[in-house]
Amino acid sequence: MNSEQGVMNYGQDMRWGLLYCPKKGIHESSRRWSRLKRTLDERGVRYDFVQSESADSVERLMTMLLRNGYKTIVIVGGDSALNDAVNCLMREVREVRETVHLGLIPNGVVNDFARYWGFDERNDAQTVDWLICHRVRKIDLGCISYDSKNGTHHDRYFLNCVNIGLTADIMHLRRQARKLLGSSHLAFLSSLVLMLFHRHDYKMHLNVNYEDTCRSVMTVCIGNARGYGQTPSAVPYSGMLDVSVVYNPPGRQLLEGLWLLFTGRFLNHSSVHPYRTRELTCESSKARVGIDGRMAEQPTGQYRIRIEPEVINFLIPE
């Protein structure tokens, strides 16, 4: 089936709602959209286009697309933008959610969930061709339920992972450094340097699979997908969450752990303790929490993380 036939077979109700979330930098953003628009137009894709002005506008625009009846909504963005869109979709009633198909064209600083499926930011043509084929798979979401310091209750969904502790701190420092330096690469390097002078352990109370642990922990990753390499065996359609709990290793072993993380062998490290579960609870008053790369409000008291199986219709590669 060629691309034009794929679009024609959808019918009028399959017109895409395209939510474009640009990276920082007006010139680069304009060039990126021009390339993508050319790819879409060459394939005869019918779509309506909206662009987010900031991270806060993604959910507002997603709500607008849903209210206007779009059944195929494609997010052009990274992990955080996709997370915002999914959380907006999950606020709809089940009857609405089940009629909406969500697609992704990677365009973020971090595109870990896109990489899991094989979507490549450098190959829009391949990604668009896959989306045109409209192959749908129901995927799981993780959900973290917590209360913030002002007493507000939050239920926040995630596609990729929740990080607690050191990894969340690195992400927070990277975001802060990127605002100051403007370069994502410089921000990443500077955040790693800053971590040398940062605390590496947090008192945590974890309960996973009825195993109760109360001790100092460096970082915890709860993955619905690969979790930036920390939960490499997780898949977002298994009905389970993968959990990696990392105790504080000596300095030399910390460097070894980074090497294993970058080479895809993170679970081989002696300080990494893996679990697989449907839910867990955690309590830590000091550790930051990151949800799909974005910082959560600091939780207070115990919070619960669970799996919600097969709740999103996601467009996957052929």
What kind of region is each of these model predictions?
Residues 58, 81-85, 112, 139:
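Short glycine/serine/threonine-rich phosphate/pyrophosphate-binding segments
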Residues 53-56, 77-80, 108, 165:
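Short beta->alpha linker loops
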Residues 208-209, 214, 238, 245-318:
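ATP/nucleoside-binding phosphotransfer catalytic cores, i.e., glycine-rich phosphate-binding loops
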Residues 30-32, 86-89, 115-117, 233-234:
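Short amphipathic alpha-helical segments
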Residues 163, 167, 221-232:
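Glycine-rich phosphate/pyrophosphate-binding beta-alpha loops
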Residues 1-76, 87:
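ATP/NTP phosphate-donor binding region
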Residues 43, 91, 95-218:
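Catalytic core of DAGKc-family lipid kinases
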